[in-house]
Regions:
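Helix-start/capping segments and mature chain N-termini
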Residues: 1-76, 93-165
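Hydrophobic/aromatic-rich structural module bridging two neighboring secondary-structure elements via a short loop
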Residues: 84-96
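Short secondary-structure junctions
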Residues: 78-86, 142
């Protein structure tokens, strides 16, 4: 599937580095942000962090300095001298903050959407219960196709793309 340029995990309490865990399947929340340019800029960064912190509170993952800690880890792991066009994923559970960086795949013009009958657990949150979605995505060329989750004859969302109507 994706080739990661960075994969690191940190203890949530102390921010000490620990063995990498992607946290998929855990009780937790993630966000994926587009990072681009030199110096690096993150599209809609404030919105991503605000939604992440709100969702973490709803999941009972509470730390007063969480926003500051996430920013510290992002700055620690990004180079000021590198030109970016990547996706930065930040995932958290009650014990671990996991960050990863992968190249952003540019979609082809002839893009297909494979419909899959599936409704995510608690779809109002970007939770880490994505195992079924990832199993579908791992068998596809993500530059040419994505999955559309359908339930009750309605398209709910996609695996990785944005839907615009």
């Amino acid at each position: 599937m994706a080739t990661y340029l960075l994969k690191k995990s940190y203890q949530l309490k102390s921010l000490k580095e620990t063995a990498f865990k992607d946290l998929w399947g855990d009780h937790g929340i993630f966000t994926t942000m587009w990072i681009f340019g030199k110096p690096a800029k993150i599209l809609f960064f404030d919105n991503h962090i605000k939604n992440l912190v709100k969702s973490l509170k709803d999941y009972g993952i509470i730390k007063r300095s969480i926003k500051k800690d996430i920013l510290k880890l992002i700055n620690k792991n990004l180079s000021k001298n590198k030109k970016y066009n990547h996706l930065l994923r930040v995932a958290l559970n009650k014990k671990i903050v996991s960050i990863s960086l992968r190249k952003r795949i540019r979609p082809k013009l002839n893009f297909n959407l494979k419909l899959v009958k599936l409704k995510r657990e608690k779809p109002q949150y970007k939770n880490l219960k994505y195992k079924k979605i990832l199993s579908h995505l791992s068998r596809m060329d993500n530059s040419k196709a994505d999955i559309g989750l359908i339930y009750d004859k309605k398209i709910l969302e996609t695996g990785t793309s944005n839907l615009l109507f």
